[in-house]
């Protein structure tokens, strides 16, 4: 298996309280990888700790954490009750928010409007042609080609797929009944690709294709993406403001929540938190206390204003203040040999 590894070198000016610099490992979601690449490099410079992260998909990251071979998992899908029952107690730490965009490759089409129902019908294979009357009705000023639609989706266990299909189950009874939500879904037709980079690459190279990716990947490859109608009837593009609007409601204490298709003015409907997930008891697999301390130092660094301000620069959105407060409260429950690490 080929892993997408983001690894940075140790820097000077460490502010780690005098402990020995550590090597941390994580694996999981590719959705936040552009943000994490920046964060891990900066963290090495200010704290002296090295972070190696394998972008293998949320499902793979959760499996690695379950098998206790990483310090943290990255996931765009919070763990289900069943998944948590199969593991020791964990803490979910939202690190930023982002958007799943519906990107497309159509000659001459710079703007496209879609509804959730139409997106569901496309990925279910019920809308097969770009000039379908339902697409034409949403885009009366756009000349859509008489060409077959090529859906592109993830081949690996993916939090991005979970967010996308979670949204579709909320807007399409057909999708909920036939496909449901999950990290892996049996799409009826189209082309599969691994990771957000893989899906974005296929879309960029395939005329008449459409697929779902993290917004940063579409932006990096200059792939256009659709305005999507939200609950309020607004056709919205993702931005820091429209993603933040989706998180304006109440967040539960354990931070496990979906913010797709929320009823809020200006909200982008396929928005999500992305999480780092760690074990509540950090003494496992011969990990040292210093390694546990470095893991929490990384998470505290990500929650800092300095790092949260970076999110918008790489097409994500910062965490709401309340979510940051919940994170710090939850991190104070993390222990090493039963003793809280943060005092």
Q: Each predicted region: which residue ranges?
A:
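C-terminal motif of bacterial Sec signal peptides marking the signal peptidase cleavage site
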Residues: 5-9
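Sec-dependent N-terminal signal peptides
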Residues: 1-2
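Flexible loop/hinge segments at secondary-structure junctions
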Residues: 10-343
């Amino acid at each position: 298996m080929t892993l997408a590894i983001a690894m940075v070198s140790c820097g000077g000016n460490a502010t780690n309280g005098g402990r020995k610099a550590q090597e941390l490992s994580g694996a999981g979601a590719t959705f936040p990888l552009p943000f994490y690449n920046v964060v891990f490099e900066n963290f090495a410079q200010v704290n002296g700790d090295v972070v190696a992260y394998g972008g293998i998909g949320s499902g793979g990251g959760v499996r690695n954490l379950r098998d206790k071979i990483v310090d943290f998992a990255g996931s765009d899908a919070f763990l289900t009750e069943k998944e948590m029952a199969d593991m020791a107690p964990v803490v979910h730490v939202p690190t930023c928010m982002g958007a799943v965009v519906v990107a497309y490759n159509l000659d001459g089409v710079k703007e496209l409007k879609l509804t959730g129902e139409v997106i569901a019908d496309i990925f279910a294979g019920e809308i097969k042609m770009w000039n379908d009357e339902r697409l034409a009705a949403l885009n009366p000023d756009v000349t859509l080609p008489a060409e077959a639609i090529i859906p592109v989706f993830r081949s690996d266990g993916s939090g991005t797929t979970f967010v996308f299909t979670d949204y579709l189950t909320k807007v399409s009874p057909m999708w909920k009944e036939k496909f449901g939500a999950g990290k892996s879904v049996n799409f009826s037709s189209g082309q599969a690709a691994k990771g957000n980079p893989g899906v974005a690459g296929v879309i960029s190279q395939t005329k008449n294709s459409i697929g779902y990716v993290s917004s940063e990947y579409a932006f990096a490859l200059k792939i256009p993406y659709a305005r999507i109608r939200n609950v309020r009837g607004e056709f919205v593009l993702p931005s820091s403001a429209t993603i933040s609007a989706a998180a304006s409601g109440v967040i539960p204490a354990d931070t496990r929540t979906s913010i797709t298709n929320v009823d809020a003015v200006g909200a982008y409907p396929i928005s999500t938190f992305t999480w780092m997930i760690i074990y509540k008891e950090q003494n496992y697999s011969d990990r040292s206390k210093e390694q546990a301390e470095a893991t929490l130092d990384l998470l505290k660094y990500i929650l800092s204003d300095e790092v949260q301000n970076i999110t918008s620069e790489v097409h994500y959105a910062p965490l709401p203040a309340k979510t940051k407060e919940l994170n710090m409260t939850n991190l104070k429950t993390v222990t090493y040999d039963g003793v809280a690490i943060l005092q």
